[in-house]
Structure formats: C-alpha cells, structure tokens
C-alpha cells in the first residue's frame, strides 16, 4: 500500500502557503492567530537553494 504523504514543494505552497491563506477569510484568521501567538513562521516557506 502506498503511503499517504508524498511531499512536493509546489503542492505544499499551493495548499498551505501564505498566498493560499490570504485568499480566504479562514486562512486570514489562521495567519492572524499565528501573528498573535508570535510564531516565527506564519506559513510554510519553500526556500530556494
């Protein structure tokens, strides 16, 4: 049986990235909650080498 988590940076950014979060009201709430809590990373960032 194939495992469910097959990591891909593109999909990660599209579904959980900052732009995706800002696109919906719920996502904006997530970003604001993480800001309030003082998180260093608000959304998963994909770094270039």
Curated annotation (Swiss-Prot):
- UniProt keyword annotation of Cell division present: no
Q: Which UniProt keywords apply?
A: Ribonucleoprotein, Ribosomal protein
Is Ribonucleoprotein there in the keyword field?
Answer: yes
The UniProt entry's GO biological process terms, in alphabetical order, are: translation
| Record-level Gene Ontology MF annotations | structural constituent of ribosome
One GO cellular component term noted in the UniProt record for this chain: ribosome
Task: Name one matching Pfam family.
Answer: Ribosomal_L34
Annotated family: Belongs to the bacterial ribosomal protein bL34 family.
This protein's name: Large ribosomal subunit protein bL34
Q: Which gene encodes it?
A: rpmH
